[in-house]
Amino acid sequence: MIKSYERLKKLNKEKTRVPRTVQDTIPVDTIYKDGIFRSGNKYTKSYRFLDINYKIASGEDKNNLFLSYSDLLNSFDSSVMTKITINNRKVDIKRFKEDILIPLKQDNLDPYREEYNNMLLDKLSESDDIVQEKYITVTIFKSSIEEARFTFSRIATEFSTLFARLGSSCIELNAEERLKMLHDFYRSETEEFSLDMNDLAKKGHSFKDLITPRMSKYHNKYFEFDGKFGRVLYLSNYPGFLKDEFVSELCDLNKNLMYSMDIITIPTDEAVREVENKFLGVEKNITDWQMKQNRNNNFSAIIPYDMELQRKECKEFLDDLIVRDQRMMLCNITVVHLADSLEELDKDSETLKAVARKYVCELETLYFSKRQLDGLQTALPIGVNKLNITRTLLTESAAVFIPFRAHEIMQKGGIWYGQNAITNNPILCNKALLQNPNSFVLGIPGSGKSFLTKEEIEFLILSTNDDIIIADPEGEYDPIIKAMKGQIIRIGTNSKDYINAMDMSEGYGDSGNAIADKSQFIMSLFEQLDTNHGGISPIDRSIIDRCVSLVYQDAMKNNFIPTLKHLYGKLLEQSEPEAKSLAIKLELFTNGSLNIFAHETNVDIKSRILSFNIFNLGKQLKTMGLLVITDAIINRVNENWRKGKRTHVFIDEIHVIFENEESATFFASAWRQFRKRDAYPTGITQNVKYLLSSQQGTSMLSNSEFIVMLNQSANDREDLARLLNISEEQMGYITNAPTGSGLIKYGGSIVPFVNKMPKGLLYDLNTTKPGDRKLLIN
C-alpha cells in the first residue's frame, strides 16, 4: 500500500451527493479574486502556459524539450494533485471579426478596406476556427486560504522557472479568467461573460449562475446541455511504447474538446518500497515454482517466460527509480468533447478512438450517467479527480504525453501576416507587445518580400492614423503611395526636389549632444565620398567635427539655414591641408553636378504617407541618398514624437548602408533613436550577407524582435541559422520556399507561415511580377 496516495485519496474523498440543480454539478464552494477555488479543505489554482514549436523542432531540440518537460513533471510535489489540460476552444468569429476587420471611414480608400476585409474573411474561412489553450491546475489540501496562497505563490515561482527553460511562460489565472473558461465550455463563446463579485453579493446570486448551462441531462453514455451533446472518454489501455505525437494528433479534432491528464507523484522511498515488495513476491513465486519442479524431479526446467518478464520489469523499474532518478506517477487521462447532435457526437467519438487505436491505445466511453458527470468534472480544469482509474507510469513514460505542438500568434490589434503553416490559423502580430518593434524582412529576389511589406504598409494606412515613411531606392512603392493619396518625393540628378543634408530638428540624435550626432552623420557622408574606400582618418574626423560645430554656431548667431555649401566654405577656412582635401572631396557635391543635397529643403515632408523615391540618383549617390533620407526621417520622427504620434519607417535595400563603418555607425544610432521615439523601423533586403558582414548590421538584426524570413540562398540560410538559432527542420521552410512563405521570428518564437493574396485591387498595386505588370498595362 502506498501511504501518500492513500492519504491523498482520503483527503480527496467527498460525500456522495445527488445534484438537485445544475449549479450542484459544479464542484466548487467558494471562489477568490486571485483565482483560487475552494471546496471543503481543497484549494485549486490554474495557470495557463504558452505553446512552443515542438512539432518542427530538430531531433536534438525535441530531446532537450522532452528532458525539460520531464524535469517539470518531476517537480510536482507528492502532497498535491496536478492536472494538465488542453482546451480546444472554438473562436468567437463575431468578436474575432470585430478585432481584425478594418472599419470603413466613408472616404475614397473604402474600396481598398472592403477588399482587404474580404480577403481576411476568405482566409478565416479557410483556417481552423479552433484555438488550443493549455493549462496546468494544482490541487492542494490546506486548513486556511492563507496557507493555500503561500503554497501557490511558491508553486508559481517554480513553474515560472521550469516553463522558461522550455521556452514557454506560465501565467496565473484570476477568478474571472477561470470562470470564463468554464462559461465558454458550458454556454459556448458567443455569450458575453463578465464577473462582478460585489454585484453578485448585492443580488444574492451565486457565481455558478453565470457559468452553468440552463439545462443538463446525464445519460448512460453521453450528456447534453442547452442543445449540445457531449461525451467523456478515458484512456483504458496503454502500449509498451508510445510516440510523442499521440496527444497532438488526439487534440487535432476540429471541435470543442478538453483533454486532461491527472498526475499524482509518489515519494521515491515509498515507490522503491512498493516495487521491492512486488519484486519479493515475484521471486517467491519463482522459488515456489522451482521447488515444485524439483519435487517432480524436473531439475532442468526453465522458468516460465511470464515470471522472467515480471522479474526483469521489476529490476528495470527499481533501476529507473534508484539509478536514473525517475519518479513513480499515478496517472489517468480523460477526454470530453461536444457536438451539435448525437450522430455527430458518435462520429467524433469514433474518430478519437481511431486515433487511439493507431497508437495501440484504447479510449473507452464512461458508462452510466453518474460516471459521465464524474468524468466531466475530472476532465475540466477545476482541480478535482473523481475517477479511481490510474495507471502507474515513470516520469519518462508520462512525459511522452507531451502537450506541446506549435506556437500560435493571434494577438488583439495585430497585423495579418498570413496563416500558420502547421495549424492553418491566422498569424496576427502586434509589434507593440514586443520588447522592441525593430523589424527586418529578408528574402531573395522573387520571394515576396516587397509584396509582404506593401501589405503591411496598406494595413497601416487603412486602419491607423500613424505616419508612414518609406525610403524607396527602386521606385517600387509608387503605385500604392499614389493610390493611397500619399506624397512621393523624387530625388535624382535631374530632379528639382531637394532635401537639405544639414537639416536638424529639436531633439536630434540619441546621445544628448545634437551637434556631435550630426557630425557623425556628416562623417558617414564623407566616407561615401571616398572613392578609394580607405575611410576617413582621425585627423579628418576632428576637422569635420570642428567645422560642423562652427557652421551651426554661425547659423544660430546669424539666423540662417546651414547647408553643405556652408560646411564646404568652413573647411576652406581651416589651415590644415587635410581640411583642403576634405573640401575638394565635397566640392562635387556642393558646387558641382551632384549638389542635390546641398540646397535648402524645398519640399513639404509633412504628409502622413511619404515616400522618398531615389531610383534616379545613380549608383554613386544611392548610398549617400539613403543616408540623407534616413537623417531627414530622424527629424520627422522627432517632431512626431513630440506630438505624441507614432511613425512607421520602411527602408528598402538597407544592406547598402553597411558597406562602410561610418555609415553603419550612423544608421545603428538612427535605429536606436527610432525605438526611443515611438517609431517602428523595418529594414528590407535581399542581401543578408552584406548585412551580416557589418558588426553593426549583425547587432541590429540579432536584437530585432520581429524578423520575416522568406526564401533564402544557401549561404544566407546558414548565417541566419547560426545567428537566430534556427533548427534544420525550421530551415526547411526557407529552403526553396514558395513565394510568400517562410518563417516569422516574433520575440523568442519562430513560426512558419504561408501568405497568399488573391488577385484584385490590392494585388494589382503590390505585384512586381513582370507578367502581372504587363497584363495590368495592357
Predicted regions and their residues:
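A short helix-turn-beta junction within AAA+ P-loop NTPase domains corresponding to the substrate/partner-engaging
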Residues: 485-489, 696-709
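Hydrophobic positions on the alpha1 helix immediately C-terminal to the Walker A/P-loop
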Residues: 452
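Hydrophobic anchor at the beta1->P-loop junction of P-loop NTPases
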Residues: 441
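Extended, folded cores of ATP/NTP-driven motor/assembly subunits in large transport
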Residues: 1-404
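Conserved P-loop NTPase
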Residues: 724-777
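P-loop NTPase motor domains
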Residues: 52, 59-78, 85, 89, ...
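Conserved lysine of the Walker
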Residues: 449
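Post-Walker A helix-loop "phosphate-sensing" segment adjacent to the P-loop in P-loop NTPases
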Residues: 459-469
